[in-house]
Structures are given as C-alpha cells and as structure tokens.
Amino acid sequence: MRKIFFPLLTIFLIAFSGIIQANQTVYGSKRDSNHVLLVYDSQNTVEQGEKKIDTLQRMLAGIGLKVTTIKESEYQKGELSHGYQGVITMINWEQAQLVNPGFIKDRDQYDGIKLHIGEGLDTTEQQQLQVKLKTIYQQQLILKDGNSTEMMPFVDRMDVLTGIPKEVQRYGELKTQDKDQQSYAYGIINRNQGYLPFFNNTGLGLITTGKMIATLFDRQQETKPLLTIANVTPYSNLKILDELSSYCENLGVPFAVSTTTVAKNTEMDAYKRFTRSLRRIEDRGGVIFLQAPVIGGATVNNASELSELFDNYLLNLAQNQVYPVGISAQGFWDQDQVLRNNALKKANYWMLFPNKKVVYLKQDNQGETSSRSYLALAASGFNKIKNQEGVRFAMPIALTFNMPDSKVRLKNLKEQIHALNFTWQNPAEDFNSKIDVASSLIAYQNGQYSVNGKVTEVKTVAEEKSLPKPVGTPALFKEFFKVQGRIITVFFAIIFLVLAIFIAFGRKIYKNMFKR
C-alpha cells in the first residue's frame, strides 16, 4: 500500500503546484501595466492635502499611468486583485491613521509595485523595504538632488530612514543645518517598493519625486519644460500678448499659450482681432492649447452640449487659421467621466492645471492619460532652486506664467523668464499632436499644421478654410445663470416691497404726531 501511496502523493503535489503556478501566471498576465491604485487617508483640507492628491494624480497621468483614486476607509477587500500594476499609499494626515484592516492586509500580501508617501510607515513596510525609522525634531532641511539644492519648509517632527542597504536606489538627500549636518535619504527604491517621507507640490521636491516615481514604475525619461502663458482670454490685452510673444521669439524661447475662446459672436471684429493675435503666436513658433471653460450649474445631461461646444470652439478657431495642438483644463476634468470623454479626449495632448474651483458632472476618480499629458506648474515655485541648470525633469512639464494685464507686469514677466535658467522644450521638434473635431482632424508635427492630412500654412491675414460650419448651440450652462438672475431679481423686489411698506407706516406715524 505504501509503495502505491507515496508515488501517488508525489504526482498529486507536482500537479497541484503546477495548477498554482498556472494560476499565478494568469493573474500576472491580467495585470494592467498602465494602471495604479492611489489610496489616501484623508484630504486634510486644513493643510491643503487635497492639492497634493491633485498634483500626484496629474503627475501619474504625465508618466502615462491611469489612476484609480479611493479613500482608505472606503477601500473594499480584494480591490488590489483587480489587475493594478501598483498601489500608492498617500498619508496626508498622520492623526487620521489607516483604519481599514482589509486594505492593510491586501497591501501587505500584494506582490506588485508599492509606494508609501508620508508618515506612518508600519513595521511590515519597514521589513519589506529593509529599513528602520528615526524621528527628527525642529528642523529646516535642505534638499539636494545632483548639484541642485532648495530649502525645505520647517518641520516640527519627521520620520527619516536609517540602516538603508547599499544596493537600494536613493533619490535626493535631506541635510540638516546643525553643526553635525546629518544627511538622510529623501526617496528610496528597494526592488519594487518605494518610500517618500513627504510630498511637495512644487520646486525641487516635486522634481525629485517625479524622477523617483517614474523610475519605480519603469517610465524613465528626460524632458525639457514647456514655457506656457496661461489664462489668456479674448478679453486679454492683445497688445501686451503680442509684445510678449515677440519677446519670446527674439529671445529664442519656444512657448505655448493656454487660452479660452468663445462660441458666439465669432463674426465680430473683436474676435477677428483675437484670432489674428493667436496667428501671430503660431507664426512666431508658439503653440496654442484650448483652455476649458469654467463650469456653471451643469449636469450629466449636458454631455452632448459640452461636446458640441468644444467642436464649435475648435471649428471657429480653425476657420480663422488658429490650430490648437491640445486641450488644457484643471486636473479634476480627468477625474470626471463626462468632462474627460466629451472634452479632453478630443485631443491626444493634454495640459492639466492645478484645481481651483472643482465642479464635477459625473465624478468617477478614474483618471486616464493621453499620448502626452503636461503637468502644469506655476514657474514661480521653482525660483528658489539653486543651480537650476542641473535640474532634470522626468515627465512632460509646463512651467506657467499668468497672462500679464499691464506694462509693469509684462516687464516683471520678462525678467522672470530671463532669470529662469532652464533649457526650454521646442514644440516644432517633437510634437505629434492630433485633435478630432466634428468630421475634421487637426494635426501638428515637425512644426507644420495640417487639416485632414493636408498641410496648411498659417498667415497673419487669415484665409477662409473649408471646414464644417460650427453648429449653433446654446451657451453652455446658460440656464444656471438665468436661474441665478431670476432669484436675484425676486430677492430685490421683496426688499423694495418691504421698504415701501415701512416708509408708508413711518409716514403715517409721523403725520399722527402733529395731529395731536
């Protein structure tokens, strides 16, 4: 009996291990190499933690990753088995702590890429990273990355890493300013796991973070920043805009402009002057990003209206030989199904700005990416970096300046551009953008614009282009403003009525005083 039992047991174990191995292979094959799960503890709006989440989402889009974002307390057990390439734990508020045992257990057992940002690195994570924690107090650290340095904000306390193995990759150094001048690693990567003690929204900290995350997810690249003039509108001072674009051309600095436009009254002289100014920008080597409008009281039902509005924007501009190369919007547009599918996805080049006023139509927190997604950052946030020439970006970055509205601010802007010691990206050299609008395709490659595959030359005097006529659509979200107007009218009418009654009573009381 034993002679038969042991051989059978051996065969069974071999077969069983083979089945497990096969299942693991299938599981691995289902893993999406472009999709990550971002889990945060709290938005911590008091300390602007929601801005850090927004920046990280836009950064991940910039390195070509789709990102699903959920709050840790809302994590459902088993979510990590849904084919993510990696999971990012973002701690915005240490006091909130991780409270979901389902997430902690899944993360501990997960064998994909793992990144921890912020405080609260638990014992299991320390063991997996092969490091130990040390707490330092009352410090203003200096971040050093290569030859570039920047002073970090003052911290009351912070956890830093010690006992880091030699084979671990380090990104940036944090140096104290005391006599001993201790040095600690800023970010580390140990095999498929990474750690960052904090997340910066700007400056050298953000640049170093970007390089580390890009390496962790195997998305290494070296890019030049794109100089961008933001918040241009048809109502901007066009003379100042023209002088600014001329200055950039004479300085030999390629640039982009992010501008809004209008869908109505496009036959008026004011619109013609506006598009003529944009054509000069194109003629001087600049490129145009169509900036998304501010959202009013819209709903999911406005999806088709939004799509038509963008088609009209693009067609009206193209009729006047202004050919946008991409679409710019606040980051939340990529976290909203309606805004993303009916606006952003018309272009393969995006420029995602920091969130200001967030208005969702159908929030899904399923951020996607495009052929190229620029992380837009205020250029002023990089002024404090010493040795800027040594800075290397790891993803498409747009360094933005607000459109100046006076001669004084124009002068200041020129000085800022001249002071920044960056090598700027030239769109004419490496852009390959496409925008689908109605039945037409607008493209830009090797410095040439084309419409439906036919190369077109931009002239300062526009020629009528044979494109589909824009469809007459009602102004986007006009009902929102109409309702607001009616409410205000009724409100003031009631106030005047009450005042009239008080005046009448007062007049009567005043007369009765003299009758006595």
Regions found by a protein language model. Give the residues of each.
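His/Asp/Glu-enriched short active-site or ligand-binding loop at hydrolase and phosphoryl-transfer sites
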Residues: 345-382, 424-432
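Short alpha-beta junction capping motif
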Residues: 41, 81-126, 285
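Active-site beta->alpha N-cap acidic-glycine motif
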Residues: 200-205, 210-280
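Catalytic grooves of carbohydrate-active enzymes
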Residues: 224-235, 374-434
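Juxtamembrane/start-of-transmembrane alpha-helix segments at the extracytoplasmic/lumenal side
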Residues: 474-497
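A short, well-structured beta->alpha microelement
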Residues: 57-83, 376-387
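Metal-dependent polysaccharide deacetylase catalytic core of the NodB/CE4 family, i.e.
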Residues: 35-42, 115-125, 252-341, 347-348, ...
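A glycine-centered loop/beta-turn motif at secondary-structure junctions
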Residues: 34-35, 83-84, 112-113, 130-140, ...
